[in-house]
Design a protein with these regions (language model features):
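Extreme N-terminal signal-anchor transmembrane helix of membrane signaling/transducer proteins, especially
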Residues: 1-14, 289-299
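Membrane-proximal amphipathic alpha-helices
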Residues: 9-45, 52-60
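Intrinsically disordered, low-complexity polar/acidic regions
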Residues: 20, 24-28, 53-270
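Short hydrophobic secondary-structure edge segments in sensory/regulatory modules of signaling proteins
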Residues: 45, 77, 348-349
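Membrane-interface helix-start motif
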Residues: 271-291
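Juxtamembrane interface at the cytosolic side of transmembrane helices
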Residues: 299-321
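PAS/LOV and related PAS-like sensory modules
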Residues: 323-349
Length: 349
């Protein structure tokens, strides 16, 4: 039993080490994949931004031709120019003429319906859009009409680099992919010797669904070894950007990694799922059961051996007693025979 307990403890320790190693391998692989995807989205938006920077003008056909190949794990790419109050009417008329259909700068009302935008000093309406969505593009939607989008545009304007929105419900996206973020990058004219700084004249944008970006290509929840959660640490409310819906295993294992996208930092939390726990169950219980059974068998064997030895000793003692009795009887008979012989000898003499 003691040997069984020692063996079980050693096996349990070895099993824990192996489980931790397997978990770390899965964590490293998942983290590397997500980090690569996040960096890839920044690079794709950066290439679209450079396309505008290096072009005097970009037509809708040119935009579609360049943006369509970029649509990998992104719901849409869009171009939104800056339009001021006194430019609005002429801009809407020009775009309506180019499209051959009415166009207006729009905003969402309280019911989520797009309506003509109210008067403001500045607008950033979506003019071009290349999307995977079957719903279509919300052309004319003003990014400055809603606080979360306005904040993202303003941060991109101030920093001159890619800004990422807080988690939000995306416009023009199927409900299954509606939760996500916007990546916004400012577009300026190339610097010249006379003008080293130019204000952005518009913004390129990537519409990112977290479900598509994170879960695409990964195992189904019922077969995934890891439970994932991505939290926006740049947000004071620590909002959850993505959370898988598979069951968490009863384990103390957890790994937290840092992911960056634009100007936001995310905490990636990874824990083992029940699928992982079932595939890596411990053999300690089996060892204890087998050890106990083996101990019982050895005890039974030892009992049988001892019983047989005691029986053999008793048989030997019994046989020895019988031999001693026989020897005593033979000695008595021998004495009697000698007495008879002696008497016969005397008579003969």
């Amino acid at each position: 039993v003691v040997l069984t307990v020692v063996l079980a403890l050693a096996t349990a320790d070895l099993h824990q080490q192996e489980v931790r190693q397997r978990f770390q391998l899965l964590v490293n692989e998942r983290y590397s994949r997500l980090e690569e995807r996040f960096e890839d989205q920044e690079q794709r938006l950066g290439s679209l931004r450079r396309f505008f920077v290096n072009s005097n003008t970009v037509s809708r056909e040119e935009f579609d031709g360049f943006a369509q190949p970029l649509l990998m794990r992104a719901r849409a790419y869009a171009w939104a120019p800056r339009i001021f109050r006194d430019q609005r009417q002429a801009f809407e008329q020009q775009v309506s003429l180019q499209r051959g259909a009415p166009f207006s700068i729009r905003e969402l009302n309280d019911n989520g319906t797009l309506l003509p935008a109210g008067e403001r000093d500045e607008y950033v309406p979506v003019l071009y859009s290349q999307t995977q969505s079957l719903i279509g593009s919300p052309l004319g939607f003003d990014l400055l009409a809603q606080p979360l989008r306005r904040s993202t545009v303003e941060r991109a304007y101030r920093s001159g680099s890619i800004a990422v929105s807080q988690p939000m419900l995306l416009v023009g996206v199927e409900p299954a992919y509606a939760m996500g973020v916007l990546l916004v990058a400012p577009v300026t004219r190339p610097h010249t010797a006379q003008m080293t700084y130019n204000e952005p004249y518009g913004f390129v944008m990537a519409v990112i669904s977290m479900r598509q970006l994170v879960a695409d290509g990964l195992p189904k929840p019922a077969r995934d070894n890891l439970v994932m959660q991505i939290v926006d640490t740049s947000d004071t409310q620590q909002r959850v950007l993505y959370e898988s819906d598979n069951a968490v295993a009863d384990s103390g294992l957890e790994a937290i990694r840092r992911l960056t996208l634009g100007d936001h930092v995310y905490a990636l939390s990874l824990r083992p799922s029940q699928v992982f726990a079932q595939a890596n169950h411990s053999a300690v219980t089996s060892i204890l059961v087998m050890g106990c059974l083996l101990s019982l068998l050895l005890s039974a064997l030892l009992y049988v051996l001892v019983s047989q030895r005691q029986r053999a000793v008793r048989l030997v003692q019994q046989r020895t007693g019988q031999l001693h009795q026989r020897e005593y009887e033979l000695r008595g008979a021998h004495g009697q025979l000698r007495s008879v012989l002696n008497a016969a000898t005397q008579v003969a003499i």
